[in-house]
Swiss-Prot record:
Keywords: Ribonucleoprotein, Ribosomal protein, RNA-binding, rRNA-binding. SUPFAM superfamilies: Ribosomal protein L10-like. Belongs to the universal ribosomal protein uL10 family. GO terms for cellular component: large ribosomal subunit. It comes from Fervidobacterium nodosum (strain ATCC 35602 / DSM 5306 / Rt17-B1). This is Large ribosomal subunit protein uL10. The gene is rplJ. The keyword Lyase does not apply. HAMAP family: Ribosomal_uL10. Part of the ribosomal stalk of the 50S ribosomal subunit. The N-terminus interacts with L11 and the large rRNA to form the base of the stalk. The C-terminus forms an elongated spine to which L12 dimers bind in a sequential fashion forming a multimeric L10(L12)X complex. One of its GO terms (molecular function) is structural constituent of ribosome. It comes from the Bacteria.
Amino acid sequence: MLRRPEKEQLVQELTSEFQNSSLVLFTDFKGLTVAQMTNLRRALREKLGSGARLTVVKNTLLKMALKNSGYDVDSHESSFFGPTAVLYVTEGDPVEAIKVFYNFVKENKGTPVCKGLFLERKFFAGEQLEDLSKLPSRDQLIAMVVGGIQAPIRGLVNSLAGVLRSVLYALNAIKEQKEKQ
């Protein structure tokens, strides 16, 4: 059991981590073996490197750290119960972490249960995890935006090129007519 100074130190560390986090997901890890927790950590590390961490935290300390970081914890008090592990992402794509976690839950037949999460500081209930896992990744979104911007420009270029081709064909036709005369 941690002593008060150690708890204060932990809250300070978590507060600084949560202030820079794009995702804070809390889950009930009951029913997971150490090997399964290690596999989840490994999968997160493979996808996000050192930008994602999964750690077990006491609910009161977790709530303090989230409050200190500016998260709206009071409205979602019911999400903080029982044994809790927290997954947070400080760098990298938070949607990738959600996908890794969701796939892990599917592989382990619904364990662990997501209690709730903050994605870009907006709260989502644990039941929304599947929907969030279907979101496109950051890179896919950027590609979609670039494609959306590029399509009208490409269409304009093709239209202008078509007009220029028509003028060129007309000029060539006039040139050929004059050469025949």
